[in-house]
Structure formats: structure tokens, C-alpha cells
Amino acid sequence: VASYSGSEEAWKQLCERDDIDLVYIATDWKHHAAMGVYAMEHGKHVAIEVPAAMTLDEIWQLINTSEKTRKHCMQLENCVYDFFELTSLNMAQQGVFGEVLHVEGSYIHNLEDFWPEYWNNWRMDYNHLHRGDVYATHGMGPACQVLNIHRGDRMKTLVSMDTKAVNGPAYIKKQT
């Protein structure tokens, strides 16, 4: 087992090894794309937790690097592999619902049990500064599978909505 530490860039040593085929990236979001690009440029396939990138430019960097290096770059969207999602997909593919014309997706995750540690976590830094859903693929991934998006069909329009924060602020208020 190898360990890499001592600097912000120590992870690059892993990517530079000759005996590694794939790099699994499960760090904070702001490092995902840069790590993925670096790993592919050093001959590694890449598996990246969501979100794989935070900007369209980073997405294109990942795509272009993957195509240039001929290395796989896979976003690991765990919500498409859950029991409910796989069961629903199978039912749709078997025709249980008839022809599927419309789907809606969402990601609801009650974090109340985690708030004491989570509130000051790096994951919340983004949410403090921005609105929107950084885990949009959790809801859209299963919906796209049912509709065969990028498997014979494509998405023309996407509507994304965001509500005000309710549970987190209410929990914090209750604790203080």
C-alpha cells in the first residue's frame, strides 16, 4: 500500500506510476477535473465521483483529454445503480409503463443526522456561495436511462429548479 502526502500536489505521484491502470478520484469537487486530466495525460483511465467537473470548460477539458489520450473517463453516478432506480429502469425497458414520454428527477437527501459535522464541511462551501443542485445527475441519470438519452435519443430542453434552504437553517436555529 502506497501513501502520498506532504504537499497539495502529492497525488500526482500516484498518476506518474507505471504499475497503475486506473485512478479513482473521490476528493473535494474543485480538484476532480484537474486530477482527471492529469491522470489521463499520464496514461491512466479515470473514474471520478460526481460532480466530475464544476464548469463547462472543465467538462470539455475532460472530454478532449480522454479523446486525445484514448483513456476512459467515467463519472461515477451511484444513483443509477440503486435498487429502486434499476428496478424502475428494468420495468420501463420491459414495457410495464407503456411508452415513456415524460420523466422528472430529483435528489432528496435529509442530512439532519450529519449537520453537526456537515455544516462546516467543504461540501457546504459551494452551497454557501451558489444556488442550484451540484448533484443534478442523481435525479437526471436514472431519468436519462429510462428515456435512452445518448442511446438513440437526446435531451433538447432541461428545466432545473431550486427551492430555498429549509431543513438546514431550521436545524441550526433549533440547536442554538
Regions found by a protein language model. Give the residues of each.
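N-terminal glycine-/serine-/threonine-rich beta1-alpha1-beta2 phosphate-ribose binding loop
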Residues: 1-45, 57-72
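Alpha-helical structural elements
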Residues: 6, 19, 76, 114-117
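Short, solvent-exposed turn/loop segments enriched in Gly/Ser/Thr/Pro and often Arg
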Residues: 28-31, 53, 79-81, 109
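Short basic (Lys/Arg) and small-residue
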Residues: 50
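Predominantly a Rossmann-like dinucleotide-binding segment in NAD(P)-dependent oxidoreductases
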Residues: 69-72, 79-176
